[in-house]
């Protein structure tokens, strides 16, 4: 989606980035430097920049040697239950930890207040960060390149996690 692809494009300017998607056509498009979403900046960067970016359907391949893994999956909101469905976020975090327990996990998905603390406890892992996105569709890469603010949250008292958060920001 636009959150994951925009952050992948931004980071791929100076880092090796492996994007994961479940849609083969999107993976093929990214690997052929064709944006699967409408975003003028992403399209321009794909055409003009030397990005260290590839995509795969194989999540384990992407997670195995990663220092950071950004989680940008849907969290649908049910207004009748006043509830965010975070099950996909939790599934992906579990897969990352199983494959690469040392990776710093950065959640970009929309989650409820207190989620980072609860998910750290659930998985007994302190290096899970939350960094909300403030992106407009069709302007996602522009908004990542020129952010109005950068916020990264983590568990308090974890100095090494604080350093990871500062590096990510």
Write out the residue ranges for each language-model feature.
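Structural/interface elements that position substrates and couple domains in central-metabolism enzymes
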Residues: 1-169
């Amino acid at each position: 989606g636009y959150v994951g692809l925009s952050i992948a494009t931004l980071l791929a300017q100076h880092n090796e980035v492996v994007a994961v998607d479940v849609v083969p056509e999107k993976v093929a498009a990214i690997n052929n430097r064709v944006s699967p979403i409408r975003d003028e900046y992403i399209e321009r960067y794909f055409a003009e920049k030397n990005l260290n970016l590839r995509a795969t359907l194989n999540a384990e391949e992407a997670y195995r040697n990663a220092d950071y893994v950004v989680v940008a999956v849907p969290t649908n909101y049910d207004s009748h239950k006043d509830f965010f469905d975070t099950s996909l976020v939790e599934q992906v975090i579990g897969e990352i930890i199983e494959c690469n327990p040392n990776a710093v996990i950065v959640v970009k998905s929309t989650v409820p207040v207190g989620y980072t603390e609860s998910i750290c406890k659930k998985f007994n892992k302190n290096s899970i960060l939350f960094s909300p996105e403030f992106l407009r569709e069709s302007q996602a890469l522009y908004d990542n390149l020129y952010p109005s603010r950068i916020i990264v949250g983590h568990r308090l008292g974890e100095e090494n996690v604080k350093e990871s958060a500062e590096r990510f920001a």
